[in-house]
Amino acid sequence: MKSLKLKLIIFILANSWIGVAQQLPQFTQYMYNTISINPAYAGSRETLSGVGLHRSQWVGIEGAPTTQTLSIHTPLRNDRIGVGVSFINDELGYENFSYLYGDFSYTIPMGEKAKLAFGIKGGFTQYHIDQTILNDPTVVNDQFFDDVSNRWSPNVGLGLYLHTNKWYVGLSAPRVLNTDYNNGGNGTIDYVALERISYYATGGYVFDLSETTKFKPAVLLKATNGAPLSFDMTANFLFNDKFWLGGSYRINESAAALGFITDLQVSKQLRIGYAYEYPLSELNTYTSGTHEVILMFEVFKSKRIKSPRFF
């Protein structure tokens, strides 16, 4: 019973700042997982690319969010078309969202260096709530948990991605349709499971500080109807094109955090990374922080790639 109550508390607390708007999960290493929020990114690395990520948020709090993502994308032979597929599994207490989406992009050259890509994303979102909480006698009659169910719902997303080898700017809405996951959706309950449209703006630049050192700042702005505005800033240094070291800061009404990021280019095809976040809210009394690991791989089939890809 104690375990149930702890999970129930984190479930309610987390959704109190989400409000009625279910958001896509947030990532410290968002700049390396762009395909999950912007379909126009598909194929931009000019080779077959994959990203796997695991995030354990607010470690030490039972029922805190955990997220896994897996994505693969590649350009087609004519270079202008990119395709990909992405999967996200996001669990929060007794609540689980799974996203399975395909990505398509079309790229237009903008001069000698810049490229502008248009993207569309389509697929399904599954909403699931653990029956354990619904069957427990202490909450079975609580209207807070009425009208929730397991269901699959279709959705689509759109994106723009303007980039060169030195900088990028992106705009996207990975879920365009507002989805009600409650049975009936009659508005008679205090909590409703709704997936609201989120808007993302991203950007980054690579500065050459010396022959062996590069500096890459990046930003992400996320706006969701019914949820606090979120702004992420990161600053990474790259040494000898092998080792990344940097930090991050998230400005958010309820989930501000300070982070540390490190990555290692193990080989031309393989890169691994780790990020740690410390919450700058009252949550830091109950958690040791957030941990995130990422694995990136690429299969080089083309002799056309002439410079390293920094994002």
Language-model features: where?
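Subset of outer-membrane beta-barrel
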Residues: 22-311
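Active-site glycine/GP-rich loop and adjacent strand/helix microenvironment
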Residues: 19
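Sec-dependent N-terminal signal peptides
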Residues: 4-16
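Positively charged n-region of N-terminal signal peptides that target proteins for export
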Residues: 1-7, 110-112
